[in-house]
């Protein structure tokens, strides 16, 4: 079961490396990462298969997970229009997406407060 963890880190050299090292040193695969922020602070999203192990490893490095949730990861073809096709299916099902990012190996990560509806929409 994949999880999206959010860690707030300072926007400074080495901050992302510290998070990545903490997770990988615990033997947890970091399958994707994306971050957005300001000049001072960044909200980092990481995709991990084992939330508890990643959270524990981050805590040992004095890094706190501010939000955590299960997400849907979809294997996709690397071609023009794939994101449009999938998000159209989700929209037609009436599911509101609040998170989308790209993971390794041609996969898309989707988040919604309606996780069951999202899974159903993507299975159609």
Residue ranges and their predicted role:
Residues 1-124:
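A conserved regulatory-domain signal marking ACT and ACT-like small-molecule sensing domains
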């Amino acid at each position: 079961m994949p999880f999206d963890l959010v860690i707030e880190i300072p926007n400074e050299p080495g901050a992302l490396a510290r998070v990545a090292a903490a997770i990988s040193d615990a033997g947890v695969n970091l399958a994707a990462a994306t971050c957005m922020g300001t000049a001072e602070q960044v909200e980092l999203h990481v995709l991990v298969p084992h939330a508890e192990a990643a959270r524990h490893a981050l805590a040992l490095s004095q890094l706190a997970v501010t939000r955590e949730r299960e997400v849907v990861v979809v294997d996709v073809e690397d071609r023009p229009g794939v994101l449009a096709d999938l998000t159209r299916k989700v929209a037609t099902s009436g599911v509101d997406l609040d998170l989308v990012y790209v993971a390794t190996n041609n996969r898309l990560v989707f988040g919604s407060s309606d996780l069951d509806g999202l899974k159903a929409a993507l299975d159609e």
